[in-house]
Structures are given as C-alpha cells and as structure tokens.
Amino acid sequence: MSDWNKNLAREIAKGIIATGIEGGYDSVAKSTAYNYPSIGVSQWEGNRADELLRAIPGGEEFIGRTYIDIKASGELPMLKELLRSDAGKQAALEQLSRDCLQYVEVLQQVPTLDDTRCIIYAGMWCPTSTWVVKRFLANRYMHVDLRSLEALYKLFKDYYWIAADVGELYRAGYANRARTTYEYVAGIDLTTPYGVPAYGEAGNGR
C-alpha cells in the first residue's frame, strides 16, 4: 500500500470525524440488528466495536456487554467519557483510517475518479456502503465529470438516495449530508501536513 493511499485514507477519516456525519466520538446507541452497542465515529458494532475498546485503556470493561446491561448499570456515561478521551479519540482516528484505506482502494477502481478532493468526497460516503458508492460512480463516469467536486456534490445530492435504495424518508437527510460533505472537502487544506498536492496542481487533477 502506498503512502499516498494512507494519506488519502487519513484525510477521509478526518473528514468523517470533523463533520460528524456518522456520529461523534462518544456516540453510543443500541444496534439496529443486535442488543449490543453501536459506538463511535463510524457506529462500529460487534468485533469492530470490541477492537476499538481494546485500543483504549479501560475499554475492555465494556467488551461483550449488551447495550441494555451497560445502560441499566449506569455505566453509559462512563463509556461515553472513555470514547471521547484523548486515548479514545486517537484510537477512533486510527481505526477509521484503516477502514478508509479500503475505501480508497475500492474507489481507485472507478474510471476518472482521480482528483484528490473528489476521492475524499466519495470516500466520506463509503460508510453508507462502499460497494453502492463504487457502483453509483462507475455507472455514471461517462456522463458526469468525476474530477469536478461540484459535479460530484450535485450527483450525490440528487441521486444517491435512489441508488442506496433508502426511500423518500432519507432523501432530505442525504441531501444535507451531501452539502455538509461538500463544504468540508471544499475548505480543507491539502498541502499540509502530508504534502498532498493542492486541488488541481498535479497533472492528473490531484
């Protein structure tokens, strides 16, 4: 894996965290599918939640416990405090960056999606479904300029809710996510601290 990919992955992770589009550091909710908690900036569940907790001092206390048990015991505030501690924040960034590396590798298979900001933008949608995002873009690259952040924003705002098959109920929420993500990505400084070329300065648009 290249340093370029690692840097892109970290930028995507930082964006997901900064915007809170998947949740805050101390997000804790009852999983929709199980009785166990869904935690952190990417709503990790099961083994992924356990992985995060193991990386935080004191986190093992909560491994394998149901959401109801943690709440009934009055320990929910303690779990939240643990997740938003400095160690918790660092562990979340590292774990999310590893997840985002997979997003980058999948997105690089989409023709013409090679602009830095556009990869970051698309990557910030991948927690919804990496494969849906990939298919959504791969099916449209002939008709939409995937090297244009503005074009990508409009594409996701208007059509991604249909591709994701989430129903009309989520249409407004996805439009808000598209705007929030666009505003974040348009404003980030890509010249530091990793030396990633600024938007449009590299020969391939990166």
Q: Which sequence ranges carry the predicted segments?
A:
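Cell-wall polysaccharide-cleaving catalytic domain and substrate-binding groove, primarily
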Residues: 1-112, 116-119, 123-206
